Amino acid sequence: MSSKNRSRQIVKLGVNKMCATTERKLRILFVCIGNSCRSPMAEAVMKNLLPGASTWEVDSAAIASWNVGLPPEERCLRILQEHGLDSNHIARQVTKADFYRFDFIFGMDPRNVEDLQRMAPADATAKIELLGRYDSERDNVILDPYFETGDHGFRRCFEQISRSCVGFLRIHGATRRCHAAAAAD
């Protein structure tokens, strides 16, 4: 085998290895303080954006316990419905197991991220970061719209979350790249 063919085979094996690792289910958890506005909205947006939901797991949870067992806030549901999205999510609180189960745990603001880092076990495997870091407009903090009057804050939140989810998928949606690389061979 020539060195050129050997190099080509190694590259092909490398692509196949990357594809194999990205073909496993990627798990994402969105977190906000109460799991009634931002995180269930992000969950609904991401689920809508994913072409092959069977290779992804998406959920949302709260840092605090006061909304556990309740559906998302009325205004959140209204904005989702305006965009043709639905949510049957019921609020839950972050658990220790989440830090091992999920690959990415996204906080909506710096306080969420600080709380998550404080809650995370020392050997946690999840990557904790701000969802807004993926926003194409560099609007890193997704503010809590709960205390705002009307729907404006929820609309702003929806736009930020949508841009951020699209940005995340552009970077981490490796399965599409794998399929494209396989087709090119």
Name what the model sees in each region.
Residues 3-101, 171-180:
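Conserved active-site segments centered on acidic
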Residues 32, 80, 106-107, 161:
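Hydrophobic structural packing positions in well-ordered secondary structure
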Residues 104, 110-185:
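Phosphate-binding/catalytic loops
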